[in-house]
Amino acid sequence: MTWLLTSAAIADLDHVAAEGARKYGFSKSERYEQDMVAMLDTLAAMPQLAPERQASQQVVRLMPCGAHNILYVVEKDDVLVLRVLHGLQNWIDLL
């Protein structure tokens, strides 16, 4: 399986990288991004790893990664990442 990002997930990751670099410096932000990519690779290898959660319109999977949650669905042979949100954000309202 491969992982794919929605436009919202790309924007989320861009925000995470920019804020991380601003608050913690480039090297820490880059390590955090590498950890996030490693988790995405893990999810592509084991797409059922995260538990299913019921959102208002669909069932999604939620995998914590650092201070963030990766919200995704399994579609055919791909892991489609819907959003990457901070753990304190209300993910149900933001899907």
Task: For the regions a language model picked out, list residue spans one by one.
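Arg/Lys-rich, positively charged N-terminal/basic patches that mediate binding to nucleic acids
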Residues: M1-E33
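GIY-YIG nuclease signature motif recognition
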Residues: A9, M36, Y72
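Alpha-helical linker/hinge and terminal dimerization helices associated
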Residues: V16, M36, M46-A50
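An alpha-helix initiation/capping motif
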Residues: E30-V37, L62
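Basic/aromatic recognition patch in beta-strand/loop cores that engages polyanionic ligands
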Residues: Q48-D77
